[in-house]
Amino acid sequence: MASVAQPVRRRPKDRKKQILDQAVGLFIERGFHSVKLEDIAEAAGVTARALYRHYDNKQALLAEAIRTGQDQYQSARRLTEGETEPTPRPLNADLEDLIAAAVASRALTVLWQREARYLNEDDRTAVRRRINAIVAGMRDSVLLEVPDLSPQHSELRAWAVSSTLTSLGRHSLSLPGEELKKLLYQACMAAARTPPVCELPPLPAGDAARDEADVLFSRYETLLAAGARLFRAQGYPAVNTSEIGKGAGIAGPGLYRSFSSKQAILDALIRRLDEWRCLECIRALRANQQAAQRLRGLVQGHVRISLDAPDLVAVSVTELSHASVEVRDGYLRNQGDREAVWIDLIGKLVPATSVAQGRLLVAAAISFIEDVARTWHLTRYAGVADEISGLALAILTSGAGNLLRA
């Protein structure tokens, strides 16, 4: 009896993309440090050996995912025939394509904001170079839209545009397609066209270092500062208590007189930011009765804390998933309550703004504030808090033609 020939199983042409897609999903869901190559291979339905044909290691997968997302932004600036570099165009001409890139790559944005520190030095440098190129392109477009802005003012407005677009990667909120595009367009243009609030002279060198040394008045504060700095730089899973103690200048068991574990330090950091945010919310509501003044006060409070404690803000953005369930859930619940106050005030000031639209605008404004606070060189100017507040208010009230320019 003749044997029946078995059909030849051919390797899918897009296997490399399938592997990358599965890796992206796992990195976003669990965090880079918690995903193993075996997990990615299993999710993609391939063997580990097959995965290695396409990617050398987990870092190579992460680098490719981040590059893919950033390339979508860079390719949004169109080339005309014969060009090797795109000619800058006013923001209103490029914005439709930038919004399309933001929507298409929203799942990838979180990777370059949260996970890029796990790349090797060469890949991290490439990520920073591409981010700088993206923002520089937006700055050129802003200057063509609003001539005569200073370098500092134009760069902040470019970051406002960039953060508004990339804020989509920090949440799962959405709107119907055209409504979302219109909201993003109005918010970006409102920020770009916001007149300068004040001059931005450079701060004296060394001020920040002196301020930091002055506030570390106790073992507790020193350990919190060291923990926040290390968690931000290396990621919570990669840091141990010995490193925190060393970073704080505290040897051996001295750390445990203040904290029982690394987990306790992270939880204390998240609780602290939560309580500070709540206090600023209370202050803004007590000090003001009018909706416009209340919203301005809320924004100014958020800016103040973000500039005062950038490491703390960074930890809340990148390490929240590692906090204990009780602390994480409490933080998210309180954050939702605080943002509901912002949304209610936006609705009073701009009645045409729906609750769903308000949520997206609040997410965009907060993303901008926290992105700037975590970008050192942008914060080294006197008056930058007022400038950030004015731009955030422009985003929040963009449905009303910049009602609350500060």
Curated annotation (Swiss-Prot):
This is Transcriptional repressor Mce3R. Residues 36-55, 240-259 bind DNA. SUPFAM superfamilies: Homeodomain-like (SSF46689). InterPro entries: Homeodomain-like_sf, HTH-type_TetR-like_transc_reg, HTH_TetR. Disruption phenotype: Cells lacking this gene result in a significant increase in the expression of mce3 either in vitro or in a murine cell macrophages line. Keywords: DNA-binding, Lipid degradation, Lipid metabolism, Repeat, Repressor, Transcription, Transcription regulation. It comes from Mycobacterium tuberculosis (strain ATCC 25618 / H37Rv). One of its GO terms (molecular function) is DNA-binding transcription factor activity. One of its GO terms (biological process) is regulation of lipid metabolic process. Residues 13-73, 217-277 form the HTH tetR-type domain. Induction: Negatively autoregulated. Mce3R represses the transcription of mce3 operon and down-regulates its own expression, but does not affect the transcription of mce1, mce2 and mce4 operons. It holds the Pfam family TetR_N.
